[in-house]
C-alpha cells in the first residue's frame, strides 16, 4: 500500500461548485485510516462560496493507489449487518408500484436484490467490476458519466456514500437531473461536513473523501442543478459503527502540542505530568459530552441522508 502511494499523482483544483480558484487552507492530515504518514492532504474552503474540498487531490487516474487491497471486500459480502442496513435504507424510499431505481455505487448489487424482492425494477452502476454479482440485476461498470441511461427514466436514484468520493459532483448532479423522472427523487448518503466527526475529530476518510458537503452547500448544489431539498436526515443509524466525534478532545489537545500524527495514531507519545493530567480531563470530556444520539439531535452527527426533488418551474 505505502509503495503504491509513492506513485500517487496529485492535482490542484478549483471549486467544483462555483469554479473559483481562491481558497483558504483549513487543516492537513495524512491517511489516518491506513496509517500512511508520508504525505499530508490539505482540506481547503472556497473563499467565494464556502465549499470544502481536497486540494491538491489524487488524480482520477491514480485514485486506485489510495485504496487498500481489502477496501472493497466488505462491499461485496452481504452479511447480517448489511441486510439490516438495507432495511434502513429502504425506509427512505417512496412506495411506488413497479418503480425503476438506479443505485450509484451498487457494488455487487446486494441492496438492489433486496429491492427487487419488493417489486422494484433495479439498475446499478459501479466503477469497480466485482467478482461477486447478484443474479438478475442490471449493472453497468464504470463511472456514471461514462455510462448512458434514458432521459426521465428513473423514479428514484440513490447513492450511498458515493458523492464525497467523486471528482466532479456537479457532473453527477447534472446527469442525475436528466435521467430522473420529473416527479422522481435523488436520495443519497454523505458525510456531514459540519459534524464533530468530520470537522473537529479529523475522522473523514481522507484522501478517499475529496469533497466535504455541508447542508448549505447541498442546498446550493440543488439550486444550481435543478433540484430542491425535500428533506435532510441527520443520522448515525445506517452503519453499525456510528460516525461519532468521540475522541475529538483528545486528538485536538495532542495536536495543539504539535505531536505528530504518527505518534497520536500509534499511541506512542510522551507527556509531562501536567500534560498527562490535562489529557486525562480530555478523555473525561470525550466520555461525558459526546454521544451519537446527542450528535443526531443537534445535527452534529457524521452522516446525512439527503432527499432531493426536481425543481420543475
Task: Give a label for each model feature.
Residues 40, 71, 137-141, 202-204, ...:
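Short low-complexity, flexible loop/linker segments enriched in glycine and/or proline
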Residues 1-78:
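N-terminal juxtadomain amphipathic helix
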Residues 74-88:
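Conserved SAM-binding loop and adjacent beta-strand
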Residues 167-175, 185-309:
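S-adenosyl-L-methionine-dependent methyltransferase catalytic module, highlighting the catalytic core
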Residues 46-48, 308-311:
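Active-site beta-strand termini and strand-to-loop segments that position acidic
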Residues 3-12, 86-202, 209-225, 304-310:
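Conserved SAM-binding loop
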Residues 39-43, 160, 300-306:
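Short hydrophobic/aromatic beta-strand or adjacent loop that forms the aromatic wall/cage
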Residues 23, 122-123, 229-230:
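Hydrophobic anchor at the start of a short beta-strand
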